[in-house]
Amino acid sequence: MSDFDSNPFADPDLNNPFKDPSVTQVTRNVPPGLDEYNPFSDSRTPPPGSVKMPNVPNTQPAIMKPTEEHPAYTQITKEHALAQAELLKRQEELERKAAELDRREREMQNLSQHGRKNNWPPLPSNFPVGPCFYQDFSVDIPVEFQKTVKLMYYLWMFHAVTLFLNIFGCLAWFCVDSSRAVDFGLSILWFLLFTPCSFVCWYRPLYGAFRSDSSFRFFVFFFVYICQFAVHVLQAAGFHNWGNCGWISSLTGLNKNIPVGIMMIIIAALFTASAVISLVMFKKVHGLYRTTGASFEKAQQEFATGVMSNKTVQTAAANAASTAATSAAQNAFKGNQM
């Protein structure tokens, strides 16, 4: 209080600490923006750095986006579904086979009660000769093999028709060339020979092989069918004096007469188709044979069992044994007398 000056005429800034030159020099160096900024004034805009954006609420729904890697439980579910589908498929197949076996068993029982009559070839009732074989694909052949056996049956029929047309082709060739009498005669012989022999020698063994799953009959079919395929190739070739309207004979006949040559070319094409289809079906039957579990060892066992169980063979063996024993006894008795 001692420093307080009551003189009204004295300089008011004399004792003012804020008027010190060192203080006023520092205050003059403040940036001009701070002097002009008034925090309580609304007329002036705040500096750009101090402006804050309002918080906008997120309007998107809270959905979890799937990642690239699927969870482990998804893969397990898929594997379980595939395994279940496979089991259902196998179950349906087993049920179908069981139903087929039941149906075949009932039909076999009906046939055993009423007798199994031959129905092939389908001849009229008043014909002097009756059917020789029994054939029913739905009864004898399993479902998975019926289509193949039917195709082989149709192939046999196709070859028989081709042999029948071959007779007319050789006849037409003989009409324009009198030196082809041998071909015409052989064409008749081939039709009468190959039609029944092919049915008995390779088709019936195939039918019986699929009917009873016989390995021995499969091997009989393969052996005979290879020979049959060789016959198809020779017939398609058509060598002279062999009784076939093959390609060689067709070209020769075409030089003699164009209509006859065209007819022979058609027959040669049928023989060629028989050879090609025979090769395709041979591969198909061989593939099915590999899936049936047949083998050469089983064929040997079936052959031995069939031979030993055959009554004719048993009778012949017994007669041979008795004859040998009788002759041995007689020789021994004569030796003792001497």
UniProtKB/Swiss-Prot annotation:
InterPro entries from the UniProt entry: SCAMP (IPR007273)
GO molecular function: protein domain specific binding
Residue list for modification Phosphoserine: 2
Region (Disordered): 1-64
Lumenal side: 177-181, 240-261
N-acetylserine modifications at: 2
Annotated positions of the Phosphothreonine modification: 45
Residues exposed to the Cytoplasmic side: 2-155, 203-218, 283-338
Annotated membrane topology: Multi-pass membrane protein
Keywords: Acetylation, Endosome, Golgi apparatus, Membrane, Phosphoprotein, Protein transport, Transmembrane, Transmembrane helix, Transport
Transmembrane segments: 156-176, 182-202, 219-239, 262-282
Domain of life: Eukaryota
Cystine pairs: none
GO cellular component: clathrin-coated vesicle; cytoplasmic vesicle membrane; membrane; recycling endosome membrane; synapse; synaptic vesicle; synaptic vesicle membrane; trans-Golgi network
Subunit structure: Interacts with SYNRG, ITSN1 and SLC9A7.
Protein known as: Secretory carrier-associated membrane protein 1
Taxonomic lineage of the native organism: Eukaryota, Metazoa, Chordata, Craniata, Vertebrata
Name of the encoding gene: Scamp1
